[in-house]
């Protein structure tokens, strides 16, 4: 996705129907906004023309990227069936006496194929609903119209997105959410208690919101909350859950069928998860909850805007984490707090042609202090997982850092 700029949101309430609340599910919409380019200064006619040309090129690239990700959703079934067919060919290449030892193997592959078809149906439902998802931007029609082969990178992203449904919107992911989200929520409640604050006037930003559960939980408590996300994979999916799902556990997915290793039982690979585990439309009446799409550093530039910024498994997505710290310092109000929980698994490490500054937590803390933040809470070994397969023979655990720092008055 190309970088997109958008002014910070107003502190007033969202237009009627854009927040959560009771009533019929068809009337409840979480507003999704795409970042807007700011107007360039008119230095000269030539400069203005060059700026327009640059912006038009950015818009073209962004539109291409939008449709490329939709194509990946549509190509999922083809890609996964090719993977299963390859497994079948390899099995059939075994000696007949070895094949006879595994009479259920091909039947299991057929079950996986049915799971693939079901996942594809859900993915098509998601993208069929996202063409007009942004209240302030349209991407036109798909000029090609054909389903094209998607890159391995995009298919890996899509498979990862399916696991995000487990983390954010299934009962299976509750333990992971409790480990990652609850420490952040507890700090919000401690710093902005309802006995002393009107939560509707406490503006909280959640960069890297993913499928939106943390931001939604904060809005459920009555705070004015906005999630920000860069990935179209996440945005398409969060739009579907937040705006089109109201019946608890109506949908199911098979997120583990892509994992052919470390399965204790064959049935573990094809077990479903159900979502959403709550009604996303059950936000309190008058809730102020929205999502923005685009680059965190470019969308949020207005100084002294936010009472709280909550980052979860986010700061290691930076090319340069100091840029994130700089943005957070600028946009926090004096007296505002930054709550962070997560590891430091830098996303751009070892990627060719990508800037990546990998700092230790010690270095990050020193930078945070030099900006002027005051540390109020610091825990260096908060154990957590990320989109874990709880029945897998292999699991990754993170010893996360949790800190709360305050920008002085």
Curated annotation (Swiss-Prot):
GO molecular function, one term: carnosine N-methyltransferase activity
Chain intervals for the UniProt region annotation (Disordered): 1-25
GO biological processes: carnosine metabolic process; L-histidine catabolic process; methylation
EC number of this enzyme: 2.1.1.22
Superkingdom per UniProt: Eukaryota
Signal peptide region: none
Temperature dependence: Optimum temperature is 50 degrees Celsius.
Assigned keywords, A-Z: Cytoplasm, Methyltransferase, Nucleus, S-adenosyl-L-methionine, Transferase
Sequence positions that bind carnosine: 316, 347, 398
Expression tissues: Expressed at higher level in kidney. Expressed at lower level in brain and skeletal muscle.
Effect of mutating residue 396 to A: Reduces N-methyltransferase activity
Effect of residue 398 to A/F: Impairs N-methyltransferase activity
InterPro entries: CARME, SAM-dependent_MTases_sf
Reactions catalysed, as given in the entry: carnosine + S-adenosyl-L-methionine = anserine + S-adenosyl-L-homocysteine + H(+)
Gene Ontology cellular component terms for the protein in this record: cytosol; nucleus
Annotated residues for binding of S-adenosyl-L-methionine: 164, 167, 208, 229, 295-296, 312, 324
Function according to Swiss-Prot or TrEMBL: N-methyltransferase that catalyzes the formation of anserine (beta-alanyl-N(Pi)-methyl-L-histidine) from carnosine. Anserine, a methylated derivative of carnosine (beta-alanyl-L-histidine), is an abundant constituent of vertebrate skeletal muscles. Also methylates other L-histidine-containing di- and tripeptides such as Gly-Gly-His, Gly-His and homocarnosine (GABA-His).
Note on domains (UniProt): The Gly-Xaa-Gly-Xaa-Gly (GXGXG) motif binds the adenosyl part of S-adenosyl-L-methionine. The carnosine-binding region forms hydrophobic and hydrogen bonds with carnosine, defining a flipping orientation of the imidazole ring so that N1 is present next to S-adenosyl-L-methionine for methylation.
Complex formation: Homodimer. Each monomer accommodates one molecule of carnosine in its active pocket (residues 313-398), precisely anchoring the histidine imidazole ring such that only N1 is exposed and deprotonated for methylation.
The protein's name in its UniProt record: Carnosine N-methyltransferase
Species this chain originates from: Homo sapiens (Human)
Classification lineage: Eukaryota, Metazoa, Chordata, Craniata, Vertebrata
């Amino acid at each position: 996705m190309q970088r997109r700029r958008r002014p910070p949101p107003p502190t007033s309430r969202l237009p009627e129907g854009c927040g959560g609340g009771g009533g019929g599910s068809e009337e409840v919409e979480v507003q999704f906004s795409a970042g807007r380019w700011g107007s360039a200064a008119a230095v000269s006619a030539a400069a203005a023309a060059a700026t327009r040309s640059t912006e038009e090129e950015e818009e073209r690239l962004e539109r291409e990227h939008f449709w490329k990700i939709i194509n990946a959703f549509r190509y999922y079934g083809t890609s996964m069936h090719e993977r299963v067919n390859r497994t079948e060919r390899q099995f059939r290449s075994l000696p007949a006496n070895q094949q006879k030892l595994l009479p259920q193997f091909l039947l299991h592959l057929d079950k996986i194929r049915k799971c693939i078809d079901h996942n594809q149906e859900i993915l098509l439902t998601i993208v069929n609903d996202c063409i007009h998802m942004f209240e302030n931007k349209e991407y036109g029609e798909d000029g090609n119209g054909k389903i094209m082969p998607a890159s391995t990178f995009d298919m890996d992203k899509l498979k990862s997105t399916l696991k995000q449904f487990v983390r954010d919107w299934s009962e299976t992911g509750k333990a992971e959410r409790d480990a990652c989200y609850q420490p952040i929520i507890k700090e919000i409640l401690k710093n902005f208690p309802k006995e002393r604050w009107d939560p509707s006037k406490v503006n909280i930003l959640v960069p890297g919101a993913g499928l939106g559960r943390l931001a939604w939980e904060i809005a459920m408590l009555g705070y004015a909350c906005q999630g920000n996300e860069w990935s179209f994979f996440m945005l398409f999916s969060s739009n579907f859950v937040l705006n089109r799902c109201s019946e608890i556990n109506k949908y199911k997915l098979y997120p583990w069928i892509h994992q052919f290793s470390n399965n204790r039982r064959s049935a573990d690979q094809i077990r479903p998860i159900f979502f959403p585990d709550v009604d996303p439309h059950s936000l309190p009446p008058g809730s102020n909850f929205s999502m923005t799409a685009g680059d965190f550093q470019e969308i949020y530039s207005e100084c002294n805007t936010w009472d709280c910024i909550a980052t979860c498994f986010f700061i290691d997505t930076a090319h340069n984490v100091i840029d994130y710290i700089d943005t957070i310092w600028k946009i926090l109000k004096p007296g505002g707090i930054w709550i962070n929980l997560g590891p430091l698994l830098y996303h751009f490490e070892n990627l060719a042609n990508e800037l990546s500054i990998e700092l230790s937590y010690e270095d990050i803390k020193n930078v945070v202090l030099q900006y002027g933040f005051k540390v109020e809470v610091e825990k260096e070994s908060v154990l957590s997982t990320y989109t874990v397969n709880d029945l897998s023979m292999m699991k990754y655990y993170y010893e996360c850092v949790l800190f709360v720092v305050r920008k002085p008055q």
